[in-house]
């Protein structure tokens, strides 16, 4: 796993963002941090990361925002948050009932190609928006797909805010509804960040 500080200005509050598969900061770089520091974790080829999590203890308030596969991965780290938001993901993200159906996921790995990756990114949106320019290596993204099959969420972790898009073509909306037991509350595709201008809107 990798990390990157998106805003590090010595604020008393920090937003911890667990990104989705294959992504970098391009999907959320437009969000204003306001009076919060922001750190992003991404690239789940391994869960080992060269980061001292005790650094986060200096913040008086820690907020979690996780998206897609990051919803599961965030639960695997022992961090106490003031609030936690799950966006278009579940704790069973590769699952016939609660996530991406297993057969579809395996077929995605088997047939993964640069063209397939580009189609995936396009399918994250349900409207004509400028697609993010993700600067991740193809082979790294491909191996990350396989690595994610090896992880299981900490089911004791509790999210207190759930955001579900009504037209998610990646993790089917109906499967998210089945997992969380709430109706969709965002009018978008899998990547909803273009609906927002500030991180605080996601807390």
Regions found by a protein language model. Name each.
Residues 27, 73-77:
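Hydrolases whose catalytic domains are alpha/beta-hydrolase-1, hotdog thioesterase
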Residues 170, 185-203:
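Catalytic histidine-centered segment of alpha/beta-hydrolase-like enzymes
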Residues 29-30, 158, 169-181:
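Short alpha-helix in the alpha/beta-hydrolase fold that links the catalytic acid
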Residues 1-59, 190:
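Active-site catalytic motif of lipid deacylating hydrolases and related acyltransferases
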Residues 80-111, 133-138, 144-149:
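Flexible "cap/lid" loop of the alpha/beta hydrolase fold
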Residues 162-168:
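Short beta-strand/loop motif that positions the catalytic acidic residue
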